[in-house]
């Protein structure tokens, strides 16, 4: 399979040295993303595109390659092509007939040729000749340029002919690793996950910072969605997941700060903490999922007071977004189900939160706060490589994995319903129950406690996360099913 990758248009208008650096980085990222599927993958580039060639013929693996590239920042779209030496017009007709002839009978079609290089003919000459011959030879109903039923697409580049089978859209943006890094404050909800995605899509390496307000289940949930975002959209680069224990900070706020200023104070403490982490990692910008006036702490006066807690640049990609638009994008990128079932901890709830915090009043309230509490929390922060968050879980609770299910055991398929439908898990003589990952924590308690359950997912990532959580909740009848 050969793919022609068209790079993000904004890359092509950069200076030659910058353009070469960005395209070289994109090529490196593509190799990183696909190397486990094809260690021999070839990636070569020219000024506005890259050619990706794999000798893997397994259609399932090819589909996985295509899926990963559609989620790789830096790619506008890519073409699935067959490549040939450029012959005369009749040879082009023969190649097009071979690939499209069976689709043209009784159909209205069009030919689109894109050409680059020095030739004694134009793209329009190719369109007319190939279209005329295909109409005569394939029994087509006619040529329709505006809304063709079948589109025959070819590219000619110097002395090479490319017959295009499919075009797959990418997410655009710059290649990860070509721009700067950011640190996103993650709660695991709709807003923070979409904000993180938008930074990654633009091409910024995005590390994750979670302030744990007192719930292990919440921490596991945020680990899970952060790992998902990285794996799907950013796995070409290694980033960190930082977890900061904020229980004492919350307690100090509840005891020392006036009720109306609790929410704003908590946000300021989080920004201070995130800025401290960013300094350690030499990161210049923080990212939050805040939108104007979505909640009381997000009015413009309050955001101004919150931002004054740090000199760091605070990016808010969702600032002017409507909530439904955010939810729609979360659904599109695959984080909505995580957000809907994310465990919540609401330890700081103001009865009458201020919507117009005053600077002098904020200074007064923070004077009551013992900053040593914040410093202790930051000292206990955990820095975990995002690809090792699953390994981290096994340090406090042993998670048993089995390669074979035994009669009497129940395998719970926790994959997304779409994956369950596409590739149903069928095990002879073994009961299999479908229970998506986002529902298992709430539904597991209703299962028969005398039975033994094996959690299954494709990679073993989500199954280990949820097995860890269930074991920590006291459910000893849980294992992970990892067939060989």
Curated annotation (Swiss-Prot):
Keywords: ATP-binding, Cytoplasm, Disulfide bond, Nucleotide-binding, Redox-active center, RNA-binding, Thiamine biosynthesis, Transferase, tRNA-binding
Subcellular location: Cytoplasm
InterPro entries for the chain: Rhodanese-like_dom, Rhodanese-like_dom_sf, Rossmann-like_a/b/a_fold, ThiI_AANH, ThiI_fer, ThiI_N, THII_Thiazole_biosynth_dom, THUMP_dom
EC number: 2.8.1.4
GO terms for cellular component: cytosol
Catalytic-site annotation from UniProt: 457
Keyword Nucleotide-binding found: yes
Alphabetized GO MF terms: ATP binding; CCA tRNA nucleotidyltransferase activity; tRNA binding; tRNA-uracil-4 sulfurtransferase activity
SUPFAM superfamilies: Adenine nucleotide alpha hydrolases-like, Rhodanese/Cell cycle control phosphatase, THUMP domain-like
Chief subcellular location: cytoplasm
Disulfide-linked positions: 346-457
Domain THUMP: 63-167
Residues reported in the UniProt entry to bind ATP: 185-186, 267, 289, 298
Keyword RNA-binding: yes
Biological pathway: Cofactor biosynthesis; thiamine diphosphate biosynthesis
Residue stretches making up the Rhodanese domain: 405-483
GO term, biological process aspect, one: thiamine biosynthetic process
Reaction(s) catalysed (UniProt annotation): [ThiI sulfur-carrier protein]-S-sulfanyl-L-cysteine + a uridine in tRNA + 2 reduced [2Fe-2S]-[ferredoxin] + ATP + H(+) = [ThiI sulfur-carrier protein]-L-cysteine + a 4-thiouridine in tRNA + 2 oxidized [2Fe-2S]-[ferredoxin] + AMP + diphosphate; [ThiS sulfur-carrier protein]-C-terminal Gly-Gly-AMP + S-sulfanyl-L-cysteinyl-[cysteine desulfurase] + AH2 = [ThiS sulfur-carrier protein]-C-terminal-Gly-aminoethanethioate + L-cysteinyl-[cysteine desulfurase] + A + AMP + 2 H(+)
Function according to Swiss-Prot or TrEMBL: Catalyzes the ATP-dependent transfer of a sulfur to tRNA to produce 4-thiouridine in position 8 of tRNAs, which functions as a near-UV photosensor. Also catalyzes the transfer of sulfur to the sulfur carrier protein ThiS, forming ThiS-thiocarboxylate. This is a step in the synthesis of thiazole, in the thiamine biosynthesis pathway. The sulfur is donated as persulfide by IscS.
Family designation: Belongs to the ThiI family.
Matches recorded under NCBIfam families: ThiI_C_thiazole (TIGR04271), tRNA uracil 4-sulfurtransferase ThiI (TIGR00342)
Protein name: tRNA sulfurtransferase
Species of origin: Pseudomonas putida (strain ATCC 47054 / DSM 6125 / CFBP 8728 / NCIMB 11950 / KT2440)
